[in-house]
Amino acid sequence: MGSEMCIRDSGKPEHLIEYGKQSAMALGVDSIDLLYLHRHDPEVPYNESCEGIKALLDQGVAQWAGVSNVSIEQLKIAQEILGDKLVAVQNQYSPIHLDTQDTLDYCAEQGLAFVCWSPLGGYRHPYDEHLFDPFREVAETRGVSYQRVVLAWELAKGDHMFVIPGAHRPETILDSLKADELELTEEELAKLS
């Protein structure tokens, strides 16, 4: 979707349907595997935006749906409208951003994937750096990067947890991939919580 399409009226069902079809065409696919409703348009009731996504599912433009940046209240609305086609929630979560813990827990209860964006905290203010000190301590003991420890801690939250860290260098990508192999002890997890 071009940015000019997303600036105005992006949450209206008719626009979401149009954008979804254009996205499938641009990707060269008949059907998008997982289509996210990324941001709530404050000018459009959330249930109406979800109805637009449902129409795309019903038309076969998408197979599965996800929602992003949602509260539990919005998630419940999406569940009601999208039913079992809703499979994923993508919210920010990191040692700095723990305010979506309730949504993370709710996803575990509901069998929904929780896709954690900005799992390393994204842009950080210097006054947030102390929040990573316990991760640095565990990393030093283990001989790995603290970023790998952060990702391993997040992945330890459950099988429903997925992380999507950003990276610019190949070695950073490879380090992030190894987080799945790092099994933290109960003592380490307690220290990080």
Q: How would you describe each model-predicted region?
A:
Residues 11-27, 73-76, 99:
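Short, acidic/polar
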Residues 44-193:
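Beta/alpha (TIM)-barrel catalytic core signal, keyed to glycine-rich beta->alpha loops juxtaposed to Asp/Glu
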Residues 1-7:
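Short, small-residue-biased leader/transition segments that mark boundaries at the very start
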Residues 22, 31, 52-56:
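Structural preference for long, well-ordered alpha-helical segments within the folded cores
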Residues 24-45:
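Active-site groove signature of glycoside hydrolases
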